[in-house]
Amino acid sequence: MMRNRSKSPRRPSPTSRAANCDVDLLKSTARDREELKCMLEKYERHLAEIQGNVKVLTSVRDKTFLLYEQAQEEIARLRREMMKSCQSPKSTTAHAILRRVETERDVAFTDLRRMTTARDSLRERLKIAQAFNEKAHLEQRIEELECTVHNLDDERMEQMSNMTLMKETITIVEKEMKSLARKAMDTESELGRQKAENNSLRLLYENTEKDLSDTQRHLAKKKYELQLTQEKIMCLDEKIDNFTRQNIAQREEISILGATLNDLAKEKECLQTCLDKKSENIASLGESLAMKEKTISGMKNIIAEMEQASRQSTEALIMCEQDISRMRRQLDETNDELGQIARERDILAHENDNLQEQFAKVKQENQALSKKLNDTHNELSDIKQKVQDTNLEVNKLKNILKSEESTNLEVNKLKNILKSEESENRQIMEQLRKANEDAENWENKARQLEAENNTLKLELITAEAEGNRLKEKVDALNREVEQHLNAERSYKSQIATLHKSLVKMEEELQKVQFEKVSALADLSSTRELCIKLDSSKELLNRQLVAKDQEIEMMENELDSARSEIELLRSQMTNERISMQNLEALLVANRDKEYQSQIALQEKESEIQLLKEHLCLAENKMAIQSRDVAQFRNVVTQLEADLDITKRQLGTERFERERAVQELRRQNYSSNAYHLGSMKPNTKCHSPERAHHRSPDRDLDRSLEENLCYRDF
């Protein structure tokens, strides 16, 4: 039972553990009851043997008394006959001879009696000495056995106390095991979570390694591209040198052209003065035109945007109204569901309270049953004490055989008490089994209801969260609708003002267009002259611009290459930092795993130590049971020795009786008359032998009874 408790991986519920304890107690009580039954049966057998021995002794005593009386009657009859025969004168000589023979006979008888008494006294002394020696030896042995029995009882009591302590320690250990199992479950969950984190970190690490390898490849490519770009830059530097040389030559040409341009510029200045006046007028008109065109186009764009915004706002309003109606429907549905869930939760809470009350009642019933079990244990202990008292009474019954009927009545009473206790134990076992089944059913129901209650609570929480979210959504949509309505009103007011400004701008445009037509006619003549000058200038500018563009392109390529290199370096530094962080995280996770493994190993070592303590206690119990078996074997050996001594005594008695018979035969063969006179004497002597034999038998039987009681 202790091993089964210690080896159980999964911890049972407290009610099942209490039921197991009650079952163990019932088993122990049943075992004690069976032992008491066996003891009672032995006691009854011993009483029957005592009664048989008493009957045999009484019958032998009666027979010896009858023989003694018959012998005395025969002696008296013979004496009367002799006295009658002695009165005749013829028998005086015979009478004298007879008297002389009688005196000789009496002397011989007295000598024989003296010799037999001396022999019998010596034999009795020898037997008594042997009996006393054996008795002393046996008493010493019995005292030793009693001491060993007392020691064994003390050890058994100590072991029972140790067992109770061990049971308490086992319960404490089971509680610790449960707490450790919970901690282990928590640590396992934490380990699983940490493993998941480690796996995610490993995946991240692998991804980062892949990214690193990709970036390294990319870096290699970029380095290769850098080398190529550097080579290109070298080539471009050479080209730039060539271009600078060409530029110097072209600048010289430009200086020559500049001189011609100065001449042309002087001519142009005189034309420019004429143009400036007209261009100022044209510029002012163009600026005003451009401004008005821009404003008109801006207004048109704004109007189009406003119209689009109004359309979008109307569409958004429709969508928002649809969303609001849908949200209201969902809100109504969620409110209905919340009401149903609240009602179901109230019902479940009521059922849970009922189940808890029933569970408390079942616990009270279990406590009452445990009290009954304790009462039965106390009664059993009382019965054991009664049995011990009866043993003492049986020891008294060795000396007083007349109180047998009272002991038989007490034995019958004890049997009746044991039968009633057996029936009560069976009833208690059935009640316990039923109570355990009811408790397990109620516990299962309570667990199911708790699980349902938890699920309903979670559903309620989710429904409340969804309701709050939907309310927030509806409020946000209402705010958006209000904002859209306000924006639509502002857009309408802006459109009205823009329409008014557009009408004014169109009128101003018509006026400006008339002025523009007159200015364009003046411009056409000046433009022809400017076009000729600009064409030659543009050719030179184009050549310079082309060269500048080529130089800028090369510089841009260089800047882009440098920026890419810097970006790659920054990426490399970031990746190194992330790698270091990942390595630190991995090291921390490994430390946590190592610490958790150490804690688990310590807990497992503690559990193994407790298991070893349990095994040691069980081994001690087994050793003690072996010692008890050895003591029983010793007792059986002593009984066998007693049987051997009894047989030896029987053989000695048989030899003694045979010697007596031989003496009788010798006495018969010596003289018929002497034999006739010896018959009553032998008959008188037979009760003495019976008396001499009876103490031997009494001693043997007393020794047997003592040993039987010790065994009992």
From Swiss-Prot:
This entry's Gene Ontology molecular function terms read: structural molecule activity
Mind telling me which InterPro entries this protein's record contains?
Answer: Centriole_BasalBody_StrucProt (IPR051877)
Residue ranges, annotated region (Interaction with HIF1A): 571-703
Q: Where in the cell is it found?
A: Cytoplasm; Cytoplasm, Cytoskeleton, Microtubule organizing center, Centrosome, Centriole
Name a single GO cellular component: centriole
Q: Where is the signal peptide?
A: none
Predominant localisation class: cytoplasm
| Residue ranges, annotated region (Disordered) | 673-699
Query: How does the record describe the protein's post-translational processing?
Result: Processed into N-terminal 27-kDa and C-terminal 55-kDa fragments.
UniProt keyword terms in alphabetical order: Cytoplasm, Cytoskeleton, Phosphoprotein
- Biological processes, Gene Ontology terms: cell projection assembly
Q: Which residues carry this modification: Phosphoserine?
A: 161, 702
The UniProt regions of compositional bias labelled Basic and acidic residues, in chain numbering, are 685-699
Q: Which domain of life is it from?
A: Eukaryota
| Entry comment describing in which tissues the protein is expressed | Expressed in testis, predominantly in elongated spermatids (at protein level). Detected in spermatocytes only at the mRNA, but not at the protein level.
Family, similarity comment: Belongs to the CEP135/TSGA10 family.
Q: Which PANTHER family does this chain map to?
A: CENTROSOMAL PROTEIN CEP135, TESTIS SPECIFIC 10
Subunit notes for this chain? Answer: Interacts with HIF1A.
Q: What does this protein do?
A: Plays a role in spermatogenesis. When overexpressed, prevents nuclear localization of HIF1A.
Protein name (database record): Testis-specific gene 10 protein
Encoding gene, per UniProt annotation: Tsga10
